[in-house]
């Protein structure tokens, strides 16, 4: 498939994180809610490409009944494929759980989902590949989309819980990037990175929380668990949990800066986070689940639309839109989770009521009101 900018010079990419669908989907209202969101999103945004950011379907069934897995995957993406919209996907850590990665990659391809391995077989990972977006006339390569396999858990959990993108993958990326420079007049081709597990530099979008911010702060993950974080000034949207990045920094982000041209990186993996911001000039965006199967905190399941402009490929627009913002009503969540939109809103409202009831002091009321407005939305 050859991607190119539309006649209006735009190219729209719609992102879905961590759907985690299960084999009982045909009778489960959580699947219906996910499909409501996916359907509403593709109908409203009319994307040129959809991207699934890993942990898309439960692979526990694969050993016993691979056909049931294929049927589930086919039904999950039906709102996209039935509208003849291309869809690409990366492998999440759970697609690696049972040792069927090569078969799963092949099954994605057979269903028309873009997933393959362009890297040499000796390179770590089962699905490292790229797609080029051409000019609207189809003649000139303009933009590159990288799809990187971020692997599973580290083989030594004392070093890191989650694995990272390995050195040989980084070397492959750098070598391929050099080839793209030749196609782009000797300059780095502007590009995006799509992968499941975030890089450690994502923590640079956060800062250590002050004690009065602890009700809305998140605990860091694994080796950072003794520290509580909130978003830095300039970090957009919702920090719902400590980013679950590797504990070892293997230099992937440094490689992006070295190669040049990487405008943004988009991750799944963390089911509550949808925050984003710039680190050293690279836009990094975390994607919470677009489904209702994984742990979540209300009707905040969302999608992200990224729009490229052929006339200015080094700039892009992006927006989040959540389940309730589409005017949808959940069939799978209880009344509390349907009413409140996230953990922080619930926490701050409870704290507000308790503080006001106990103290009745204007100063405390003002502080609680400020915290609700600042952090609770």
Stretches found by the model and what they are:
Residues 22-25, 58-61, 89-100, 153-156, ...:
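Active-site environment of divalent metal-dependent phosphoester hydrolases
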Residues 10-23, 142-152, 194, 283-289:
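Active-site-proximal beta-strand elements of phosphoester/diester hydrolases
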Residues 25-30, 54-77, 95-113, 205, ...:
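Metal-dependent catalytic neighborhoods of phosphoester/phosphodiester hydrolases
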Residues 1-5, 70-186, 213-217, 305-307:
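Extended active-site neighborhood of metal-dependent phosphoesterases/phosphodiesterases
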Residues 1-70, 74-75:
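N-terminal active-site segment of His-dependent metallophosphoesterases
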Residues 350-372:
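Hydrophobic alpha-helical topogenic segments used for membrane insertion/localization
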Residues 45-49, 144-146, 159-270:
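His/acidic metal-ligating clusters that form di-metal
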Residues 2, 7, 130-134, 237-238, ...:
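Binuclear metal-dependent phosphoesterase catalytic core
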